[in-house]
């Protein structure tokens, strides 16, 4: 963690990651972007799962193992956790058992886990989209864009896209998803 006013380090955490899978340069095992609610920082690493750290001192608050993703290509994991209210969402689309998961930010308990059996390896981070008075959790992957109920994980809608492997996240502006 870095002090935004001075640029000086506040604290640093290192993790024992175990054996890291091979990835193609210039990719990194730290490709995911952390999320923070101002009290906690949530980080994802493919060999650790999601770890919650205290923003003040870096102390580990909880850890949720997600299982190592299985990728046929050596690009490595890149999706990032997303916060909405007191829920943390993460999509692990891999070549064996893709799923979308919701965790309680306070303790890391699983609220729901929705399989995505028609998805192969993907690298997109979910986004929240509010349109027509409803907020959906939207995830791109394997030639589809899908919307889910963020409270239950139920798939609400799907839209076909042109690409099989999607590496970018959807962008939301007003009531439109790009």
Segments and roles (model prediction):
Residues 1-178:
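Noncatalytic, solvent-exposed loop/strand surfaces
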